[in-house]
């Protein structure tokens, strides 16, 4: 795995703790729970597209939304999608800033988009299972957008 992707994964895990109060680790031995929502965002990394996505189980999705917003959003799907999308945007902004400090050009190109259910790219640059007491998630990196859904 490239240094850029490793840095992204580290930034993502730190962002979960910092912004959503959710401890998480990479655990490839853990089986992913069924995906409730997939959220993606288009970044540009050193002149190449990088689509990063988070596929979350229902428990993880609502826990992230509630952890980020500071209020329970259980069952409030649209508000929860907005909260997790904003969380993802904040984490990706932090990643962009971190990479720029290291001399790399990483920019956010488009706002997050979401799809209810699983979405997978034809070709992955990286994929890893993230486990947490709040539920399981899959973190995905690709070169082409694969979430055909609504922006928010």
List the model feature ranges, each with a label.
Residues 1-152:
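N-terminal auxiliary interaction/assembly segments of multi-subunit proteins
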């Amino acid at each position: 795995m490239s240094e850029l992707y490793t840095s992204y994964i580290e930034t993502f895990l730190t962002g979960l703790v910092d912004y959503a109060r959710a401890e998480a680790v990479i655990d490839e031995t853990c089986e992913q729970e069924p995906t409730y929502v997939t959220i993606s965002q288009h970044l540009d990394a050193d002149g190449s597209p990088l689509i990063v996505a988070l596929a979350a189980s229902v428990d993880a999705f609502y826990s992230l939304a509630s952890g980020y917003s500071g209020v329970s959003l259980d069952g409030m799907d649209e508000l929860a999608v907005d909260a997790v999308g904003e969380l993802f945007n904040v984490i990706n902004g932090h990643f962009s800033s971190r990479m720029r400090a290291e001399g790399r050009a990483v920019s956010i190109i488009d706002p997050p988009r979401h799809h209810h259910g699983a979405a997978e790219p034809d070709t992955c640059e990286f994929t890893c299972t993230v486990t947490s007491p709040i539920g399981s998630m899959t973190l995905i990196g690709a070169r082409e957008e694969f979430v055909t859904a609504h922006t928010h």
